[in-house]
Amino acid sequence: AYKNALTRLPLDKKTLIEKDGGYQAGSYWRSVGGSVYDFYDYHYLGVNPNSGLPMYTVDEEDYSPADFDGVKGLEYGQMEDGTYWVSQTSYASRQKLGKSAIPEVYGGISTSLEAYGFDLSVQTAFQIGGYVYDSYYASLMGSGEYGQNWHKDIFKRWTPTNTTTSVPKVQNNTQNISEASDRWLITASYFSLRNITLGYTFPKKWMEKAKIRSLRLYVVGDNLALASARKGLDPRQSFSGSTGYNYSALCTVSGGISLGF
């Protein structure tokens, strides 16, 4: 298991420390006893079934209908549980999300077998727990610009005949439908098949007749498979839960002959 906790805060952050003894550092919240990578951002509540616009949490002290009235395209209200919401992140409130990029457990499993001249070795890696911010997926779910590619999940978007969905309606010239929020946080758990090697060593008595000391044929496969919470997502990009334009480990298959005289 992996444990991570802050034991003290830097002195130069004293002016930023709030009532609960922590401070914001980009998309993270730093506090004593918390993880170095606890996410801090907007909380996505879903889609307004009446309009198709997104809903983001706003703190009660920041909720001001008098200030909201007259703002173009802005919707606001209160959920049945008392939570206040707005449709634009410019008026929403960032908050501690209770999710960390730090995994609960990570490791690997490997094994090797030999029988009747055959040898097989397998190496795997895994992670359980933690969250990753899937920025690729977010960019494919509505950038607010023309000529952009879309993820197939956009077909689940709100329409007048599909009002029970978590995907807002499509809009141009707005980032609110894909703004940074916990909507794009997804579990970073994964299982990867890192290597499989299969070989066969010919019997010595066969090789003696050919005046060869040893002969082995083998096939090697690297990075053959990755299972994650969303197809195409590689949570291994960074330990901080961020994603970038990086290549995943390439899948390769090769073979060879080991010959000894």
Segments (PLM) and residue ranges:
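Conserved small-residue
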Residues: A1-K99
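Extracytoplasmic loops and strand-loop junctions of Gram-negative outer membrane beta-barrel proteins
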Residues: Q24, Q88-K96, Q148-H151, N176-W184, ...
